[in-house]
């Protein structure tokens, strides 16, 4: 067993050697990356994922809530959330070095069926775990991640050993201090999973009018309980969540065709172009045309 500092030292060496700005896969569910510039905030979605930052720092904004995780910290996203994120510490001399593992609910559920899971603390009946949590990894967790990353230099062993180490990482997450979020991901009837179904429903229909009653039915909850739970998990109301998706999709459309602001607004569900422009400016700090012009100019400079 390595101690935390030496484990991170080797992890940094391996990721610096093999990582690139485009994530490099290790088996089916894990990736490493090396990012050498901070860059502007960019929209993406989290997926359900465990991230271990070996070096650097990243800032994620989920609605009005901001999460920052840095060197030797971990982040868990138990719901696929829309975020605006960017690295705040990354350079050619000291790149951001990270490991990420997709959290697969079926594997988490399988671990929760093991007799050893019966000794885990019972989940609280209070508010659900937030969709994003940040914390410090244990020595055992860093060691397991290190053994996963070492497999990139052992291609003959990768297919056999990567699934075993993945299970170990998941188990350590389940029984660790941030385990509530991961355990809820594996329980079909958990609040996090129910909210996750509603999140996907909104994603698939973001341009349509939103009905809290219909969303509550999707989540199999009362409207009042659903609204509280959605806010607790996503840090946004359902309306705010939908607005985030609409504005980001409109931004993508305007980058492709900046001449048709009204068309982009209508395509993502806005009936009023003026309301769209007001909310766009509030979200991105500039009018649609000014924002897109700045993005295009920045892309051209790079």
Please report, for each region that a protein language model flagged, where it lies by residue.
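N-terminal regulatory/effector-sensing and dimerization cores
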Residues: 22-121
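Basic/polar phosphate-binding segments, predominantly the helix-turn-helix DNA-binding elements
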Residues: 168, 172-178, 185-187, 191, ...
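Residue at a beta-strand N-cap/secondary-structure junction
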Residues: 59, 209, 258-259
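Amphipathic alpha-helical segments enriched in hydrophobic/aromatic residues interleaved with Lys/Arg
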Residues: 2-7, 108-172, 180, 198-200
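Generic C-terminal helix-cap and adjacent flexible tail
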Residues: 293-302
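A short, N-terminal "cap"/entry segment at the start of jelly-roll beta-barrel domains
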Residues: 1-26, 31-33, 39-40, 125-130, ...
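Short alpha-helical segment immediately N-terminal to, or the first helix within
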Residues: 201-205, 252-256
